[in-house]
Amino acid sequence: NLRIYGTLRNLGLNFACAFTGFFTALHSHLVNAITGRYYDFSDAAAGFKDLVYDTFKYGINAGNKHYKSPQMAAMDYFEVGSTLESLSRNTNRNRWLNVLQNEWAFGIYSMSDYFIKGQILNSVMYNYKNVNGVFLSKEEYFNKYGRTEDTKDNWKKYKSFKASIKFVNGELKAIDPKDQYAVNKAKFTVGNTAKNLAASADG
């Protein structure tokens, strides 16, 4: 089929275009970290660390179809980017074999999408912290309480949205039940912020 061949050739095998898209998205992510409007470098660094660790752990469990990746659960829940899990359609095969089989031509797009947008989601989740029962972004917090040495020190002590949640059968739950109301109230803002930033990273 010439149409399919053309699509594969022009998209899946166009590595120059794929790498351009990757670096465009990476640039957008770094600009966000520099400006600090939605997250800063500390949030981005923590988000990157989590994504690498989760991907490594996912690789170790590649042969275990029952393993659930917290990173991919978050990306699926908030509908941010593509996940490696979404590429594993044939559950009777090794997960990495599924990725290669199902997305051999589009793999570089899917991997870059996962790698950058996963970081964006993590960074946003780290930027929101539970301040007296309400999740506030760093900017919201300092606008409300002022930027002093005390408020800076206090900010470091608050627990992030990322550290406050877990996924149980695809549902978002607070690790501490008393935080469930705050999590439910903040999840739409957190999710929409990450989704919009991820979309803008596509250029």
Short names for language-model regions:
Residues N1-G203:
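Hydrophobic, often aromatic-rich secondary-structure segments at membrane interfaces
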